[in-house]
Amino acid sequence: MLIAVSSADRLDLWQAIVLGFVQGATEFLPISSTAHLKVVPVVLGWGDPGVAFTAVIQLGSIVAVLSYFRQDLTYVLRGLVSAVRRQDFRSEPAQMGLGILFGTIPILIGGLLIKRFIPDYDNSPLRSLAAIAIVSIVMGLLLGIAEQLSKHQRDLSQLRLADGLWMGFAQALALIPGVSRSGSTLTAGLFQGLKRDTAARFSFLLGIPAITIAGLVELKDLLEAGIDGSSLGVLAIGTLSSLIFSWLAIAWLLRFLRTHNTWSFVVYRIIFGGVILTAIATGTLQNI
């Protein structure tokens, strides 16, 4: 049972489950799911699964975050509706809602520009292992700086539209493989003085529109290109695996950040990037 994910690579059922786990376990941690979905299969000799497969199984992560934050989303939506009726957007849920809406615009524009002007982005040098490793180290250092400088004082009740815009521009950087959408938005939130778990919580909510749209677009492209039933089944299994482990990762990270700082992720990202660069330099790993 195989699924075509690019012109050269195919995944079997077990590989789809493993990559679903990798996607789910890393999507909401500030370590880049895209980087791990590129590195893990290459290290295991499976090849690069490609942008399309990565984007589609992210839909499992979206179902997880919608389920986990259903009360938050209801609160925000009701607040937005009430704000529209009253023409007063100063309330907490209205500010959160506007932050999510306007914070989504930068990554949508960036994604459209890439799709329009870089049709072969799947094979871009930015997706090479060396580029991903360097980006991982740089983003790890930025997270460390944010952790050190942040006041960690502001919670969701103090969230404003400006925070959503700032984190939205940071989210757009995640179009570069290895940046980490969760990592870039968490870093931006910390620079804004948000508490760690507050920055993470809003980061998850902010990511819902962008990840959903990206996943649906890639799924549509796959269906239009022609994909058989067995391949859809394997893709579904990978997405289900992503859903389960995404939910677990969200729950764990929010608990972790209430009582811990982000230095463990900083160290991990630097080591992750360093190991990849060393492996490439020594010829242990091919820079694909």
From Swiss-Prot:
- Top enzyme class: hydrolase
GO term, biological process aspect, one: regulation of cell shape
Task: Classify the protein's membrane topology as the record does.
Answer: Multi-pass membrane protein
Gene label: uppP
Q: Has the keyword S-adenosyl-L-methionine been applied to this entry?
A: no
Q: Which family does it belong to?
A: Belongs to the UppP family.
InterPro entries, A to Z:
UppP
Give the principal location in a single coarse category.
membrane
Q: Where are the transmembrane segments?
A: 11-31, 49-69, 94-114, 129-149, 159-179, 199-219, 234-254, 265-285
The species this protein belongs to is Synechococcus elongatus (strain ATCC 33912 / PCC 7942 / FACHB-805)
The family database entries (HAMAP family) matched by this protein are listed as:
Undec_diphosphatase
* Name used for this protein in its record: Undecaprenyl-diphosphatase
The record's keywords, sorted A to Z, are:
Antibiotic resistance, Cell inner membrane, Cell membrane, Cell shape, Cell wall biogenesis/degradation, Hydrolase, Membrane, Peptidoglycan synthesis, Transmembrane, Transmembrane helix
Give the domain of life.
Answer: Bacteria
GO CC annotation terms, alphabetical: plasma membrane
Localization, per the record, is:
Cell inner membrane
